[in-house]
Swiss-Prot record:
This is UDP-glycosyltransferase 79B8. Pfam families: UDPGT. Coiled coil: none annotated. It comes from Arabidopsis thaliana. It is an enzyme of class 2 (transferase). It comes from the Eukaryota.
Length: 442
């Protein structure tokens, strides 16, 4: 029997980071390893149902120190606007004493981290291994966080002429520029000083970008595969949504979801709704209420609900995205191109229309659209604005089975799904990852 290890996990205080770390923790626990998961106190309740091995994965809550400017009680990115991320990062750095005390008391064999660049210092002092585990795409890491990199400029030797920023991406780079200096320092410092770099991806999608990162940091890069979550079949799809979707033929409904951090301005939210209406297809929109509105209904265009009654639903609350994507009536998924969302969608038969908002989403969109040609990107103006016509045109182009573009993306998506779904591929990544970790610990 292979020896087991005890790992600490300390992800950035965002559910988009904590949940993928917990998916990895589940895979490690399944193989008999012990995990101590460090997280903000308030986040524990929301993560408990993702813990499939509560006897092996122990949550270790941290008290988040107060930082001037951070709202009282704010502990995760869900509690703040994107512009306050730097303040939450300060709070994360101030938990160092708590983390070090836990390391001293519990003596793990290794510690996984992402933004806490000081973890390798603690690890070396206590003779344990540190793993910089990145859940963002390897494409983004290669382009944005190469040593000596400059925001928005491809670094020397970058391995793609297609996966690039363009003039119309200034809106996404503007958001990234707010915290780029901090992020660049955190990630590059972590990469240079850690023992192991690990990425949530696979060679079939991002192999050349992983090789580039390895060459830039002179370290072997371990891959976990996409770490797809186990499907939660304990709760069926919300009855109201299930009833709505079941009224339509297979692969006829357009589903739109933009992730937990994207809040649209009211005029852009209305343009999104009008674009979905313009397709003439049945649709389900699941997004947060627009700025200045407490509900999605408040922000809808005048007369919209009456015009789309029976064929369109705008949902302002949380939805069971994996169950919706698995529903036979869903034919197209309009999304923000978060890597986790794309991995989910690639394993379905839904066609993809991509509407990226943040820098990492833009690059992953180009990978899917320009290199793999499995999706279509919604065109934008230089300001970042997208029109109802550009959204409608993108959706109709992938939903038209007879168009050249529709045939191309369907064919390429089917091939990629077959590759990723081939027997043993994804479990093989996890097995190899664990084996390589154990070799480092010998």
């Amino acid at each position: 029997m292979e020896p087991t290890f005890h790992a600490f996990m300390f992800p950035w205080f965002a559910f988009g980071h904590m949940i993928p770390f917990l998916h990895l923790a589940n895979k490690l626990a399944e193989k008999g390893h012990q995990i101590t998961f460090l997280l903000p106190k308030k986040a524990q309740k929301q993560l408990e149902h993702h813990n499939l091995f509560p006897d092996s994965i122990v949550f270790h809550p941290l008290t988040i120190p107060h930082v001037n400017g951070l709202p009282a009680g704010a502990e995760t990115t869900s509690d703040i606007s994107i512009s306050m991320d730097n303040l939450l990062s300060e709070a994360l750095d101030l938990t160092r004493d708590q983390v070090e005390a836990a390391v001293r008391a519990l003596r793990p064999d290794l510690i996984f981290f992402d933004f806490a660049h000081w973890i390798p210092e603690i690890a070396k002092e206590h003779m344990i291994k540190s793993v910089s585990y990145m859940i963002v795409s390897a494409t983004t890491i290669a382009y944005t966080f190469a040593p000596g990199g400059v925001l928005g400029v491809p670094p020397p030797g970058y391995p793609s002429s297609k996966v690039l920023y363009r003039e119309n991406d200034a809106h996404a780079l503007a958001t990234l520029s707010i915290f780029y200096k901090r992020l660049y320092h955190q990630i590059t410092t972590g990469f240079k000083s850690c023992d192991i770099i690990a990425l949530r991806t696979c060679n079939e999608i991002e192999g050349k970008f992983c090789d580039y990162i390895s060459s830039q940091y002179h370290k072997k890069v371990l891959l976990t595969g996409p770490m797809l979550p186990e499907q939660d079949t304990s709760k069926p799809l919300e009855e109201q949504l299930s009833h709505f979707l079941s009224r339509f033929p297979p692969r006829s409904v357009v589903f739109c979801a933009l992730g937990s951090q994207i809040v649209l301005e009211k005029d852009q939210f209305q343009e999104l709704c009008l674009g979905m209406e313009l397709t003439g297809l049945p649709f389900l929109i699941a997004v947060k209420p627009p700025r200045g509105s407490s509900t999605v209904e408040e922000g809808l265009p005048e007369g919209f609900q009456e015009r789309v009654k029976g064929r369109g639903v705008v949902w302002g609350g949380w939805v069971q995205q994996p169950l919706i994507l698995d529903h036979p009536s869903i034919g197209c998924f309009v999304n923000h191109c978060g890597p986790g969302t794309i991995w989910e969608c690639l394993m379905t038969d839904c066609q993809m229309v991509l509407l990226p908002f943040l820098g990492d989403q833009v690059l992953f969109t180009r990978l899917m659209t320009e290199e793999f040609k499995v999706s279509v990107e919604v065109s934008r103006e230089k300001t970042g604005w997208f029109s109802k016509e550009s959204l409608s045109d993108a959706i109709k182009s992938v939903m038209d089975k007879d168009s050249d573009l529709g045939k191309l993306v369907r064919s390429n998506h089917a091939k990629l799904k077959e590759t990723l779904g081939s027997h043993g591929l994804l479990t093989g990544y996890v097995d190899k990852f664990v084996e390589e970790l154990q070799e480092y610990l010998i």
